[in-house]
Curated annotation (Swiss-Prot):
Enzyme nomenclature, EC number: 1.18.1.3
Catalysis performed (reactions): 2 reduced [2Fe-2S]-[ferredoxin] + NAD(+) + H(+) = 2 oxidized [2Fe-2S]-[ferredoxin] + NADH
Name this protein carries in UniProt: Dicamba O-demethylase 2, ferredoxin reductase component
Pfam family, one: Pyr_redox_2
Organism whose genome encodes this protein: Stenotrophomonas maltophilia (Pseudomonas maltophilia)
Gene Ontology MF term list: ferredoxin-NAD+ reductase activity; oxidoreductase activity, acting on NAD(P)H
Keyword Mitochondrion: no
Gene coding for it: ddmA2
Length: 409
């Protein structure tokens, strides 16, 4: 049976960063990364942006050149999944039937796209935007003449895909079940702004609509039927309604968790010598009032990976990384600092009509998060307000001409 001192399951951002950080921190033991996809680790965010728009080729998305991993003596088993974890024996069962032993195990599998459960969900022409294969398949259909696309889901993935497809000249309809887009992650001001932007760019954006079924001919999707009976023509459908944490084998092995694998402040699961990081890990977040949650971002995956690598190397410290996020749509750059969970007030800096503004979120008078649209200085300086739990004067906070760094922390 093969064995490695550290086995990392998942070859995304978190898994790659953990392997890199192990070597950076002097780890000399054996490292194996097990990845479901056939590719070496690559950046995910550009899939729904630059790669989809053909502004970047795939070779520019690699987190490190493929030769890097061999140079650092990091082994990869690609195109492979873990189907079973035996925490007592410190042993994994792989999808090819092999067994693989580990000293420490890092679970970095992220999540699988949540799929529709309605009639017609198994038709061809229905896509997620999670992997290179997802995007390549959709791009091939566009090249073959697809003109009408329906995007189901008004989160960041759906909005980014809609923006790219609209710029490419396709007819895009975006459907959101809630009263506004980004309802789960942003305040009403930001939602209203992005809804207007997409409509102004030609997207048929509809909120408070429910999908009844997908209709098709000869096994291929041809439309989306709404609960009211209307059928929207669609030669392709993108589903962006969230992810389901890929944690089955760990939960089956006895790990605590439900919506993600529960980890402590050191990213340790309830099973011995097993860590979990990234989108699949649920932890008590200091920047969300200690609420247990999963944070789906590159920043979180990378920083958790580094935290675990340092712990394995003997430098164990609690995970306290500052959360941040970004999204590019059209010529708009959104930068988010902090987590706005439970906010009770917002302050607008700048003018949304000028397409350059910030939304500051407060809870009990303290700054907890910012959404900055084409306002880089606000983002950079506002991070410190969030980190400090600042209680600034609201009139000064609303003055876009006053730098955030000048406000009382």
């Amino acid at each position: 049976m093969q064995r490695a001192d550290v086995v990392i399951v998942g070859a995304g951002h978190g898994g790659a960063q953990c392997a890199i950080a192990l070597r950076q921190n002097g780890f000399e033991g054996t490292i194996t990364v097990i990845g479901r996809e056939p590719e070496y680790p690559y950046e995910r965010p550009p899939l729904s942006k630059e790669y989809f728009a053909r502004e970047k080729t795939f070779d520019r998305l690699y987190i490190r050149p493929p030769t890097f991993w061999a140079e650092k003596n990091i082994e990869f088993k690609l195109g492979t999944e873990v189907t079973k974890v035996d925490p007592k024996a410190h042993e994994l069962t792989l999808s090819n039937g092999e067994s693989y032993g580990y000293g420490k195990l890092v679970w970095a599998t992220g999540g699988d796209p949540r799929r529709l459960s309605c009639q017609g969900a198994d038709l061809t022409g229905i896509h997620a935007v999670r992997t290179r294969e997802d995007c390549d398949t959709l791009m091939a259909e566009v090249d073959a003449g697809t003109k009408n696309i329906v995007v189901i889901g008004g989160g960041y993935i759906g909005l980014e895909a809609a923006a790219v497809l609209s710029k490419m000249g396709l007819k895009v309809t975006l459907l959101e079940a809630l009263p506004r887009v980004l309802a789960r992650v942003a305040g009403e001001d930001l939602s209203t702004f992005y809804q207007k932007e997409h409509v102004d760019h030609g997207v048929d954006l509809r909120t408070e609509v429910m999908v009844d079924s997908l209709v098709g001919e000869n096994g291929k999707v041809t439309g989306v039927q709404l609960a009211g009976g209307e059928v929207i023509p669609a030669e392709g459908v993108i589903v962006g309604i969230g992810i389901v944490p890929a944690i089955g084998p760990l939960i089956a092995a006895g790990a605590a968790g439900a919506n993600g694998v529960d980890v402590d402040e050191y990213c340790r699961t309830s099973l011995p010598d097993i860590y979990a990081i990234g989108d699949c890990a649920a932890f008590a977040c200091d920047y969300a009032g200690g609420n247990v949650m999963r944070v789906e971002s590159v920043q979180n995956a990378n920083d958790m990976g580094t935290c675990v690598a340092k712990a394995i190397c003997g430098d164990e410290k609690p995970y306290k990384a500052f959360p941040w996020f970004w999204s590019n749509q059209y010529d708009l750059k959104l930068q988010t600092a902090g987590i706005n969970l439970g906010f009770d007030k917002t302050v607008i800096r700048g003018n949304p009509e000028e397409r350059s503004f910030s939304v500051v979120y407060l809870k009990d008078g303290r700054v907890v998060a910012l959404d900055c649209v084409n306002m880089v200085k606000d983002y950079v300086q506002g991070r410190k307000l969030v980190e400090a739990g600042a209680t600034p004067d609201l009139e000064a906070l609303a003055d876009a001409g006053k730098p955030l760094k000048e406000l009382q922390y």
